[in-house]
Amino acid sequence: MSTIGSFDGFQPVSLKQEEEDQPSENDHLSTKEGNSGKDPGSRRISRQQSITKATLYPNPYRQPYVSRKYFVTRPGAIETAVEDLKGHIAQTSGETVQGFWLLTEIDHWNNEKEKILLLTDKTLLICKYDFIMLSCVQVQQVPLNAICCICLGKFVFPGMSLDKRPGDGLRIFWGSTEGWSLLSRWNPWSTEVPYATFTEHPMKQTSEKFLEICKLSEFTSKLVPAIENAHKNSAGSGSGKELVVLTQPILIETYTGLMSFIGNRNKLGYSLARGSIGF
């Protein structure tokens, strides 16, 4: 007599075994590759290599995070500064700005300072601008007809100086150094220095825009004709000055240079992000 619900005659089946017996997609690929007469391993390696792509990073010598540390490179910073300074010049003197540049000033103690230079028909303006607060800190106005000499050349230092800088510079004289007092010469904060020394800004290579406004040769090519025109216009007043352009080494008299060594290594003269503090 048979019993309802009896499982006699049924055999247990392993689902795992059935799954292993079924061909996978990789097996199909291997079969196709085998039919083509090629080694599956080498075919798989060549397929992995084909999905890789090597490209050169733009500006490999200038990492993006380095340029972002300088507030002047932030979007709209230099444009805001120039518009502020143009408005200030228009209100105070009524002159029109012919051009502007972003350079590094090197004072008589070899300290670097970030400066914006603006040129009008009559005046050279050397501006210290705070790119963090977006406000002008100081403006030094130099009449073009007072500039008597321009010196172009490489920087030279006394033998014992700690902070010797390479590269070329530009020095603009608007007075004689013979009457420069010893007290002013040895005062790092003196405002009676009869000249100003400039070199190119470190962010020159970050973009085409900064390449144009940070290039020292571009500034010189505009400054020299402007000074000559100013001298011609003031010739009737009996000044009789002529611009002298020299090509010779530029001496920076820092015999020890410890203060500038520390300041320049830490970029204290620039509006720079320094961790959670920027100054």
Curated annotation (Swiss-Prot):
Keyword Cytoplasm (UniProt): yes
Classification via Pfam families: hSac2
Subcellular location(s) of the protein: Cytoplasm
Gene Ontology annotations for the cellular component aspect, listed alphabetically: cytoplasm
Residue ranges of domain hSac2 in the record: 72-259
UniProt KW Ion transport keyword: no
Tissue expression remark: Highly expressed in skin. Also detected at low levels in tongue and esophagus.
Positions of region (Disordered): 1-49
Sorted UniProt keywords: Cytoplasm
PANTHER family xrefs: TUMOR PROTEIN P63-REGULATED GENE 1 PROTEIN, TUMOR PROTEIN P63-REGULATED GENE 1-LIKE PROTEIN
Family, similarity comment: Belongs to the TPRG1 family.
Protein name: Tumor protein p63-regulated gene 1 protein
Organism field: Mus musculus (Mouse)
Gene name per UniProt: Tprg1
